[in-house]
């Protein structure tokens, strides 16, 4: 399935690129999310006439993500969880918990923006967490998991 990208998509291409993807990926994800349109002759022509508008929109989204990244620089959050005396949690701290903690601290964050490379945290301690705010913008924050018992 051939598509025209309306914004940068990680590991696929940039704004305006004509890409070929599997039909399910295009039909079920890229097109409904507004990230691409089918590469028909009419859509190619319409894209070229609105190219400046799409580029301006992409630049504003990137600028917003960069401003959010500066707010997260040096930020940390403490999350309390039930833990044993050895520091092993009776559960785990995952992306949803981290996103909720930052949102409660006044820094809105979606759980899909939290990247945990090695899975959820299962022990008490300090962790560096990568936030993927945009295809070109990532920042690192500190998450402290404490025992609340």
Curated annotation (Swiss-Prot):
Pfam families referenced in this protein's UniProt entry, alphabetically: Ribosomal_L9_C, Ribosomal_L9_N
GO cellular component: ribonucleoprotein complex; ribosome
An example Gene Ontology molecular-function term: structural constituent of ribosome
BP terms from Gene Ontology: translation
UniProt keyword terms in alphabetical order: Ribonucleoprotein, Ribosomal protein, RNA-binding, rRNA-binding
Domain of life the protein comes from: Bacteria
Keyword Manganese: no
Stored Gene3D superfamilies: Ribosomal protein L9, C-terminal domain, Ribosomal protein L9, N-terminal domain
Keyword field contains Cell inner membrane: no
Family of this protein: Belongs to the bacterial ribosomal protein bL9 family.
Function as written in the Swiss-Prot or TrEMBL entry: Binds to the 23S rRNA.
The protein's name in its UniProt record: Large ribosomal subunit protein bL9
Species of the source: Xanthomonas euvesicatoria pv. vesicatoria (strain 85-10) (Xanthomonas campestris pv. vesicatoria)
Lineage: Bacteria, Pseudomonadati, Pseudomonadota, Gammaproteobacteria, Lysobacterales
